[in-house]
């Protein structure tokens, strides 16, 4: 590994050259003599997404790519056939950079995902516009030969419904089989099976447990492919949809680990360590009796012994931000493991921007080298070869939804090459910058938000503003490209996005401060963000609007009645009127 580190040092000058090139490109874009706002269709035109994965050796790159050139071309979304046939699966030999189209799509059918099984063969999942009952899985060699159907969805003969296969996981220890789930549309259960890729035979691993009044959300599987536990949420009774329970399997069935309600402290087990005994998870160290060890308010990462039921240690804790919040639908924690699962390289989570924690020096060096080559952007390494010499990484920012690059350490001349860009046409225009900020509410609560100023903004200028609260309300905003915010900002408006109390990501206490406050302090938090921006000298207070969707739309409509003197216009869409009715009839 030290030799590879030396190679990294040797190519740092190439990365510096790349940084200079990018700087010159961005500089040319930013010094246009006459500002021309980006056309609306360019902002709302989403590029054709792509999935990429390196083969285990890193010698081949597989990708689902657009059939046509990735240009901004808004199509009729009712043309389902066109939507279903716009991507093909391509494998590129990285030594020659020659691509090979393995499989396209037929009318009404599309590839939904793929996975390298080894350097020669890929597993492909296919779907159909005709419905879930037409899904299938097959293997294909990297040269496009030996296409073999493994399993497909089937309708039941003697009862209504059908069974749909989907990939659950690939395990390095078992190269000849994969773990799949079979979804039963009648019972809504997902049973686990081994699928042999040579014989096509399936072997039952576990049937989904039937817990009265609860529905299984997911399995907890170890590195041997053995289910060790599962999580449910309440489907019936007064706690419907707001209570989660975690179980572990025992010799005679299963045993409850703990339950937690919405907003309560909760430990969410996520990944097994390679010892198949220790579980890594996020949340609070909650004991079966409800007591909390070393309460942290924000969700921390813990290691947990599945056999003894004891918490081993708190691995990492950020006092300001949750390391994701699975209980509230936030699965943003990204953990990086070695190819065989024996080592945790590190992880990332969402603070004001993406935060990264490293446990492996080499992996940290790779990431930091790439970050230095793309200043002002967020860099995320998401795939790598078994020998850690080739990496795929994404680059995105507040002005760009992202591109994918290949980093080849063995290529000292051109170590970094772009292989896909989500919306390349955006680089032709000047877009607005978004910056995180913090502010204090009128009752002394520290809150977070994002400020976006127009590309033409001049220091000291007071400009029209739009307050743009997110939906949810149990959600949050993130730093990155937002076409709606860019639409406002490129038309000359400043934009404020605020994570008012009740937002996720900032701990339980801040979330609970929103209880009984939907039309009260939650609403005032939005106005206080505006007042903060005004104190900084940005706002023309005679020209302020508020816009939002879902709960954000509710907040906009509340503003029309609660503080009409602040706003010149209200923009509300996809409004959750149940919020309005609930506020009229209840203090909850």
Predicted regions and their residues:
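Cap/lid segment of the alpha/beta-hydrolase catalytic domain
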Residues: 426-536, 540-542, 549
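Primarily recognizes the serine-hydrolase "nucleophile elbow" in alpha/beta-hydrolase
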Residues: 531-577
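Beta-propeller folds
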Residues: 32-390, 398-400
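N-terminal signal peptide c-region/cleavage motif recognized by signal peptidases
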Residues: 27-28
């Amino acid at each position: 590994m030290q030799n590879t580190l030396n190679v990294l040092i040797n190519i740092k000058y190439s990365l510096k050259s790349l940084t200079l090139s990018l700087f010159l490109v961005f500089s040319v874009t930013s010094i246009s003599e006459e500002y021309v706002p980006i056309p609306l269709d360019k902002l709302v035109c989403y590029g054709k997404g792509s999935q990429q994965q390196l083969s285990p050796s890193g010698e081949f790159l597989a990708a689902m790519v657009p059939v046509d050139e990735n240009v901004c071309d808004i199509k009729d979304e009712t043309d389902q056939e066109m939507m279903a046939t716009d991507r093909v699966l391509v494998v590129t030999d990285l030594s020659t950079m020659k691509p090979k189209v393995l499989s396209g799509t037929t009318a009404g059918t599309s590839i939904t995902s793929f996975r390298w099984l080894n350097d020669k063969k890929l597993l492909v999942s296919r779907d159909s516009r005709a419905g879930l009952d037409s899904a299938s899985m097959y293997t294909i060699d990297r040269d496009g030969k030996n296409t073999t159907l493994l399993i497909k969805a089937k309708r039941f003969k003697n009862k209504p419904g059908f069974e749909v296969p989907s990939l659950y996981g690939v395990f390095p220890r078992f190269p000849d089989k994969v773990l799949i789930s079979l979804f039963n549309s009648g019972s809504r259960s997902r049973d686990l099976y081994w699928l042999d890729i040579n014989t096509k035979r399936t072997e039952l691993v576990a049937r989904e447990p039937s817990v009265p009044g609860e529905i299984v959300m997911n399995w907890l599987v170890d590195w041997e492919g053995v289910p060790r536990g599962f999580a449910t949420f309440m489907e019936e009774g007064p706690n419907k949809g707001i209570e989660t329970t975690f179980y572990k399997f025992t010799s005679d069935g299963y045993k409850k680990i703990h339950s937690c309600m919405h907003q309560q402290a909760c430990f969410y087990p996520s990944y097994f360590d390679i010892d198949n005994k220790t579980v890594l998870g996020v949340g609070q160290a909650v004991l079966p009796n409800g007591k909390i060890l070393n309460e942290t308010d924000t969700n921390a990462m813990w290691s947990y012994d599945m056999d003894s039921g004891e918490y081993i240690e708190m691995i990492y804790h950020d006092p300001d931000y949750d390391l994701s919040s699975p209980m509230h639908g936030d699965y943003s924690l990204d953990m990086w493991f070695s190819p065989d699962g024996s080592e945790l390289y590190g992880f990332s989570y969402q603070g004001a921007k993406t935060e990264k924690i490293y446990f492996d020096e080499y992996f940290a060096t790779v990431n930091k080298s790439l970050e230095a080559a793309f200043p002002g952007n967020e860099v995320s390494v998401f795939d790598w070869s078994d020998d850690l010499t080739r990496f795929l990484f994404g680059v995105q920012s507040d002005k760009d939804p992202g591109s994918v690059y290949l980093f080849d350490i063995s290529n000292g001349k051109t170590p970094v090459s772009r292989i896909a860009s989500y919306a390349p046409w955006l680089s032709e225009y000047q877009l607005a910058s978004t910056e995180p900020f913090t502010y204090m509410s009128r009752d002394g609560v520290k809150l977070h938000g994002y400020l976006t100023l127009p590309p033409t903004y001049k220091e000291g200028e007071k400009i029209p503003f739009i307050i743009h609260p997110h939906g949810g309300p149990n959600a949050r905003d993130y730093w990155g490209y937002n076409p709606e915010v860019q639409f406002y900002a490129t038309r000359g408006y400043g934009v404020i996005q605020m994570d008012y109390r009740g937002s996720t990501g900032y701990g339980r206490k801040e979330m609970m401060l929103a209880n009984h406050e939907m039309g009260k302090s939650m609403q005032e938090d939005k106005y206080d963000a505006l007042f903060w921006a005004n104190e900084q000298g940005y706002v023309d207070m005679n020209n302020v609007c508020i816009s939002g969707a879902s709960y954000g739309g509710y907040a906009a409509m509340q503003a029309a009645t609660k503080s009409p003197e602040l706003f010149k216009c209200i923009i509300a869409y996809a409004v959750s009127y149940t919020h309005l009715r609930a506020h009229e009839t209840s203090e909850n």
